Structures are given as C-alpha cells and as structure tokens.
Design a protein with these regions (language model features):
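Active-site helix of classical SDR
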Residues: 122, 158, 166
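Alpha-helical segment proximal to the catalytic Tyr-Lys
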Residues: 127, 171-175, 238
Length: 254
C-alpha cells in the first residue's frame, strides 16, 4: 500500500517543475492524480509519464485565475473519481523586474494567479473535503514569501500572501478534518526561476555563486520538494496544519 493509496489529488502547475514532480511522486504512492495546468500539452505529458508506470492520472486544462474554471476542475474531478482528498496549489508565475517600472498587467497577473487562483481552487475543493471530513491542502509559497530579493517585490508580496492564506485556512478547518500547510522552496532548478536569473547575470553566474545565498551549494531539484509535498499530503503529517516549511538549502538560516 502506498502512502496516499487510492486518494484523489489535484496538482496545479503539473506541466513542469515542482508540479510535475509532485504529481509523479503522489502517483508513485498510490494517488489518482489530476494534472492541471494552463499548458494542456504539458499536463498531458505528465499524465502520460504516470500512466506509463501503470499508475492513474488524467490531464486537465485550467486557468486558475478564472474562478469558473476552478469550480469546473473541482466538479469534474469529483465526478470522475468520486472524492477530492489532496489539493496541491502549485501553479504560479514569477515576472521579475524593477518595481517602479512594473506594469499594471504584471501586478494583476501575479496576484491573480499566485493568490486569487489559489483561493478560488481551494474554495472549490473544500466543500467536498468537509463532506469527507478529511483533506490535505499543500500550498506552494516560496522563500521569497519570507524574505525578498532584488527584482522580486511583486512576487514576494504574492508569496507572503500565500503564507497568511495557508494559516487562515488551517485555523478555519482545523477541527473539521482539513489540514493546510505551505512549502517555501529556495532556489530550485525550474523554469519559473530562469527570468530572475537573467536579471542577475544569467543562470551560470547564479549557479556559480549559489553558495553565497544557498549554503548547501547547489540548486534544489523539483523531486526534493515533491518528497515534502507527499509527506504533508499523507497521514504521516496528521498533526501538522498551519505550518510554513522552508525547503531552501539553508537560505533562511543565513
């Protein structure tokens, strides 16, 4: 028996990076995984990787910034699989730049995807979790939700909001069987970080000097974060709710 055997998991941002790794890791431990992403081809590719292992997955195109699409994702998941046990709110955008030059469009998109989208989908899934008297929500924040960096003012603000959203949901539903926790990754080797790296002089320069801000001396790998997602989603974390866990190679210890 897997650690999340026969549970139904929705993973957003499942086309690549941490979302892809989390979808695969949950499936490896027995979950039926809905791979949701705006990029349908990417979501389908992740689902096919899971199915190739003889496991259960499906792909779903969703723009989480659209509340109606979030409602549809939850409803269709319930119709197809009969429950919603795990929600991994991983989808996000990082559009770095100098703050006073940041357009309204970038501010709105960042907040709509990183904050409102997470709220929309959680709101859509929680009623079923309440009926089941069980559920685990894992929100992907960032180390930049705790400490900021140059060019990340708007992104950091959005990820800080994720931290407080996580704590609020945890408190609202702690006695009703639903747990909610957040993960704050450090610099992980995923496409979402590449634009920021360009502003810092390029990916090679960042990785050559990574020990200066990430003491472990290397970028994280998506699967390393996925292991933590699995733990928080499983019964092994049954006493953990409202927690904000850094997985940052020592960055926050500096």
């Amino acid at each position: 028996m897997g650690r999340v055997q026969d549970r139904v998991a929705i993973v957003t941002g499942a086309a690549s990076g941490i979302g892809e790794a989390s979808a695969i890791r949950l499936a490896e431990e027995g979950a039926k995984v809905v791979c949701a992403d705006l990029n349908l081809a990417g979501a389908e590719a992740t689902a096919k990787k899971i199915e190739a292992m003889g496991l259960v997955a499906s792909a779903y195109q969703t723009d989480i910034a659209d509340s109606d699409q979030c409602d549809a994702l939850a409803a269709d998941t319930l119709k197809r699989y009969g429950s919603i046990d795990i929600l991994v709110n991983n989808a996000g955008v990082n559009l770095p730049g100098t703050f006073h030059e940041t357009s309204n469009e970038i501010i709105q998109k960042t907040l709509q995807v990183n904050v409102a989208g997470m709220m929309y989908l959680s709101r859509a899934c929680i009623p079923q979790m309440l009926k089941q008297k069980s559920g685990s929500i894992v929100n992907m924040s960032s180390i930049n939700g705790l400490v900021s960096e140059p060019f990340l003012t708007v992104y950091s603000a959005s990820k800080g909001a994720v931290v407080m959203f996580t704590r609020g949901v945890a408190l609202d539903y702690a006695k009703l069987g639903i747990r909610c926790n957040a993960i704050c990754p450090g610099w992980v080797d995923t496409p979402i970080n590449y634009a920021h790296a360009d502003l810092l002089g390029g990916l090679k320069k960042v990785y050559d000097g990574i020990s200066s801000f990430q003491p472990i001396g290397r970028p994280g790998e998506p699967r390393e974060i996925a292991h933590l997602v699995l733990f928080l989603a499983s019964d092994e974390a049954s006493f953990i709710t409202g927690s904000v866990i850094s997985a940052d190679g020592g960055m926050s210890a500096m």
